[in-house]
Amino acid sequence: MSKLQLRAVVADRRLDVEFSVSAGEVLAVLGPNGAGKSTALHVIAGLLRPDAGLVRLGDRVLTDTEAGVNVATHDRRVGLLLQDPLLFPHLSVAKNVAFGPQCRRGMFGSGRARTRASALRWLREVNAEQFADRKPRQLSGGQAQRVAIARALAAEPDVLLLDEPLTGLDVAAAAGIRSVLRSVVARSGCAVVLTTHDLLDVFTLADRVLVLESGTIAEIGPVADVLTAPRSRFGARIAGVNLVNGTIGPDGSLRTQSGAHWYGTPVQDLPTGHEAIAVFPPTAVAVYPEPPHGSPRNIVGLTVAEVDTRGPTVLVRGHDQPGGAPGLAACITVDAATELRVAPGSRVWFSVKAQEVALHPAPHQHASS
């Protein structure tokens, strides 16, 4: 199996990315709608030619805009799985799965028993052999997606692209597909790029996470690092942590555009004037109806934008911060929310102890190897 390398600029979609995925590795790509996730996959698959860039798979160059190279999609050894399984409605499940290998190896007209045996083997891999003689219209959404996975893997791709393949499936079907993907992808050894909005997909399937914002890479790294200490706006929102942007002042605090000071523990040396971010969980935030007194060094007043009950707790969030970062959030008990009479439009004060705040260098556009 081969390592995937991508460098692509697509001007009209504002995409400018560079990253790589090793054989046997799963890279999850997160980002808001319109960030460029699907565009990046389409460039890899050969469905979209970039304005500038390179797609390399091991020692094979699939796209090179400078050299004028653009290998056809069907010759790339790239499997693509979308939200819609896109099964051929007139073919049986077994014939759908056999289609990929037949195209790749020129097996059309070869022995019927041979092609069926190959299809059944891949259907067994995804626990769908019992559907071999059915037509796609006779399958549920989860069953059809299993067949689509088998068809993609049957062509023995070096790269598997999964574009939100679990969207639209019910909880049970999605759980089953995750289990199938986890096992068959590990055995296949191919490089995998997965786009998703679901953290469960990331936790169960991915080795690394890439966060796309406005067509560029905001951050990339191991799953645990990105989701426990995110350094991008979208990463913070999806991971459920607070993120504040600013620069380091002479006293070591983070100073925001509005003039607020945030004190915390730097994760590395942060010189004065360095762009940085403060990260802390909503559970570390205390909420008061008036400015509090005492030991906490970080106090900020805000107007409540939303209140969301989550079981025994209530998430209180302010309006988006200057610059577009998500509003600060606090996680408090139902009793505390009732006592505070917190509601959208309420004026409250958030208080956070300095030891609960981590100060990180601000993220910048970068690539991965």
Curated annotation (Swiss-Prot):
Gene3D superfamilies: 2.40.50.100, P-loop containing nucleotide triphosphate hydrolases (3.40.50.300)
Gene Ontology molecular function: any one: ATP hydrolysis activity
Bilayer disposition of the protein: Peripheral membrane protein
UniProt-listed Enzyme Commission number(s): 7.3.2.5
Designated name of the protein: Molybdenum import ATP-binding protein ModC
Species in which this protein is naturally found: Mycobacterium tuberculosis (strain ATCC 25618 / H37Rv)
Classification via SUPFAM superfamilies: MOP-like, P-loop containing nucleoside triphosphate hydrolases
Binding site for ATP: G31, P32, N33, G34, A35, G36, K37, S38
GO cellular component, as recorded: plasma membrane
Positions of the Mop domain: 293-361
Subunit-level organization: The complex is composed of two ATP-binding proteins (ModC), two transmembrane proteins (ModB) and a solute-binding protein (ModA).
Keywords associated with the record: ATP-binding, Cell membrane, Membrane, Molybdenum, Nucleotide-binding, Translocase, Transport
Location(s) in or outside the cell: Cell membrane
Entry keyword Ligase: no
Catalytic activity: molybdate(out) + ATP + H2O = molybdate(in) + ADP + phosphate + H(+)
Family: Belongs to the ABC transporter superfamily. Molybdate importer (TC 3.A.1.8) family.
Source domain of life: Bacteria
